[in-house]
Structure formats: C-alpha cells, structure tokens
Amino acid sequence: MKIIAKGKVKDVYDDGDTLVFRFSNRISVFDKIIPTEIENKGESLCRTSSFWFRYIGERGIKNHFIEMIDNRTMRVRKYDVPEKVSPGSSGYVIPLEFITRHYVAGSLYDRLKAGSTKPADIGLNHFPDYGEKLPSPVFEVTTKREKTDRLLDIDEALEISGLTREEYAEIRETILKIDEMMEQEVGKRGLIHADGKKEVALGKEREPIIVDTFGTADEDRFWEKKEYDAGRIVELSKEMVRQYYRSTGYHDRLYEARSRGMPEPDIPPLPEDMARKVSDLYKTMYERITGQKW
C-alpha cells in the first residue's frame, strides 16, 4: 500500500483495486491549511461520512464506500483521476465539485454583497438577509483541481467534465435527493442542513457514483434550528473557523492579495482555546448528525 495523495484533510493510499483514506486532524479554510491540528477531527470526518455512505447506499444511491477499517480509516472503490477527460469515457472521478445551497450563506452571500451574483439569479426579488431560506435550492459547480475553486457556468462545467446535459441533470437530481434525506435525518436532532458539497464519479455505464466524503462538519453547513427559529444563526460546522478568520481580517487580506495576483499571506494558527472549541464541535457534531454516541 503506497501513499498517492496528501490532501488538505486526508491521505490517500493505493491498495490494489481499492483506495484507503486516512483522515488527519488537519484543518483548512479558504484553500489554506491552518498550522494547528484539531483533536478528534479525523475520527469525526471518517465516522460521519461512513454513516452517510451506508445511509444512502441502503436507499439505493450508488457510492464508492466499502468499509471502515478503523475510526480514522476507510476503504473505497477506486476510480480513475485523468489529467484530461476523454469524451465518452467512464470509470473516472468528475473534476468538479457540486454545491447545493438551501439558505443564503457563505460565499453566496459574499457574491451577493459584491454584486457578482444578483438576487434574481437565485430566485429572489429583494436583497436577502444572511441566513434567509431560498425559494428553491441553488445548485452550483466549481473547479476541483485548480489552486482555488472557481465557480463555473454550465457550459464550461460540461466541457471540463465530459458530461452531457442529461448526465448533469441526473447528477443534480441525485444530489438534491440526498439533501432531502439529509434534511429529514438531521432535522430529527434539531439541525438545519444549510448547504453542502459533493463529488461524483461516473461508473462503468456512466452512472453517477457519490465519492470522496460528504455530510460532515467539514463539507456541509449546519445550524441550530431552535436558534434559527428565534432569529439567530449558530454555526455548527467548520464555518465557525471561517468566521474566526473573517473576524481577524485575515480573510479580507487573503482575498485582496488573490484579486491583485500578489503573494498570499500565511494563515496564522488558531489560538489554543479556539482549537479546543473546534475539537469539541467535531465530536459533538458526529453525534448530532448521526444520532450515534461517540
């Protein structure tokens, strides 16, 4: 078994006709790895994503999960990761990230404030408040293998991915179906599933296969429902770390440098007390998302 990729949050090993994911305690925001490890994080991500893979698999949605090896390691089916997609090929990971948004938050809100996205683009006739529920889900696609994720229109997404419009529509339908399941499941434990991202492969018959990980406090945004109903947003995901770096001014400095093509500032470590809070959050969110004890 040899390591073939060291990602922002997990290491990937080649083990014959399967891959092994080893989840680390690393944490990243804004495509920057923070020089602070978060206790419990790797275990939380592995156990939570394993829960969801089993959950959707039992409900007929194909995915690459095989087994959990231990609490921080899982085995999955292997799909090709080509440098460039050949038209009509199969058995490869689509080089895109698929994002579904059910509420106004995160980078969508940033784009609305900046004017690059208009309220009408997301079905609204007014400028929304942060946290406002969308009239229908917003489905977005970004690049996956560029240095920073870039929002794509459908034509460029199809060109990069080798998908047909019909296959794109099938992926969208599958992901929205998963999100409906997630909303119902986490709603039992007082959570709102605000948004999330997923990765997809094409199987032998070019059918969609859910891959990588999803539904964790890393990929998805969760809020406390009782607080939301009272008019407050309580972040129960990695978003609390993003908000911390926004509050320090780091986010603005980073994106200013990116917009100017300047060297990016190093991201500073998390303070010790903040790292402890984040660790506790990942442990708690495993229980809140899955309904299972740590």
From Swiss-Prot:
Which Gene Ontology terms describe the biological processes this protein takes part in?
A: 'de novo' IMP biosynthetic process
Q: Which organism is it from?
A: Thermoplasma acidophilum (strain ATCC 25905 / DSM 1728 / JCM 9062 / NBRC 15155 / AMRC-C165)
Provide the protein name: Phosphoribosylaminoimidazole-succinocarboxamide synthase
InterPro entries (alphabetical): SAICAR_synt/ADE2_N, SAICAR_synth, SAICAR_synthetase_CS
Output the PANTHER family linked to this UniProt entry.
PHOSPHORIBOSYLAMINOIMIDAZOLE-SUCCINOCARBOXAMIDE SYNTHASE
**Gene Ontology molecular function terms on file:** ATP binding; phosphoribosylaminoimidazolesuccinocarboxamide synthase activity
Which cellular component terms (GO) are annotated to the entry?
cytoplasm
Pathway(s) served:
Purine metabolism; IMP biosynthesis via de novo pathway; 5-amino-1-(5-phospho-D-ribosyl)imidazole-4-carboxamide from 5-amino-1-(5-phospho-D-ribosyl)imidazole-4-carboxylate: step 1/2
- Matching SUPFAM superfamilies: SAICAR synthase-like
The family line of this record is: Belongs to the SAICAR synthetase family.
Task: Please give the catalytic activity noted in the UniProt record.
Answer: 5-amino-1-(5-phospho-D-ribosyl)imidazole-4-carboxylate + L-aspartate + ATP = (2S)-2-[5-amino-1-(5-phospho-beta-D-ribosyl)imidazole-4-carboxamido]succinate + ADP + phosphate + 2 H(+)
* EC numbers on record: 6.3.2.6
Q: Decide whether keyword ATP-binding is in the record.
A: yes
- Decide whether keyword Nucleotide-binding is in the record: yes
Q: Which UniProt keywords apply?
A: ATP-binding, Ligase, Nucleotide-binding, Purine biosynthesis
Give a single Pfam family match: SAICAR_synt
